[in-house]
Amino acid sequence: MSAPILQPLQLQGQTLQIEAQWLRAERVARPLTIFLHEGLGSLSQWRDFPLRLCEALDCRGLIYSRPGYGNSSPRRDPWPQDYLQRQAKAQLPACLDALGVARDERLFLFGHSDGASLALLFAAAFPERVRGVVAMAPHLFVEPCTIEGLRQARQAYEHGRSLRAALARHHADTDSAFYGWNDAWLRPGFERWNIEDDLRARLACPVLALQGEEDEYGSLAQIEAIARLHADTVLCALPGCGHAPQREQPEMVIEHTQALFQRCQA
């Protein structure tokens, strides 16, 4: 496992720095899995899960912090309502180019929360580049529980100590990370945000959709929507699990991901 690096990135006339880390890079003949973090996530917040998964799958891995997170360049402007669509179509391809990922390499995407939505959107926009997607706790539309969870997170961040302190261990600019995500989702009108039409009839690879039954940010309706939109979807509801299955039930996540990965290699 290589050490994290800071990679320069040119995006829309701006020069940014992207924090990234390669896993098992020496396994050049094996497929590459891209890890896409949650809305308050970063490279370091994955902990050891990506390496464990890559070892189980015998694949290479690439983790990075999106701009606004971790040690990547802080956010300069508010996220627009369609920020995930923009990231899927422009930012993620630019990051992959900057990090030396060949455009003809078919990728396996593992996304959590915002990152799961991003993985689905990228797979829909560039189906020729994706061999399979794991969408863990994805967002396809906004539910009342989503808004309530965001409000509670804001209360905890502004009036408590533990959440701010926890995030400060992983983000160079904690306010940039928190408010970029929280402000966008709580902005008036965002409750109408929906990516179902972006995905409809555009996904071409197998999808594993995982959701904790106790997820405070979304219900099983999120992954059920994926199955309605795309026939080649395996649904997995995890009893007793919240919004972070990779931390709460990592063995189950790895087991289900192995099954999908084997299908994608067949």
For each feature predicted by the language model, list its residue ranges:
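Short beta-strand/loop motif that positions the catalytic acidic residue
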Residues: 202-203, 209-211
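Active-site nucleophile elbow and catalytic-triad environment of alpha/beta-hydrolase enzymes
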Residues: 182-199
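Active-site loop/oxyanion-hole signature of alpha/beta-hydrolase fold enzymes
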Residues: 63-107, 255
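Catalytic active-site module of serine/aspartate enzymes centered on a nucleophile-bearing elbow/loop
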Residues: 239-266
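Flexible "cap/lid" loop of the alpha/beta hydrolase fold
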Residues: 117-125, 130-161
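Conserved alpha/beta-hydrolase "nucleophile elbow" surrounding the catalytic nucleophile
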Residues: 111-113
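Conserved HGGG/HGGXW glycine-rich cap/lid loop of the alpha/beta-hydrolase fold
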Residues: 23-74
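Acidic catalytic loop of the alpha/beta-hydrolase fold
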Residues: 213-218, 243
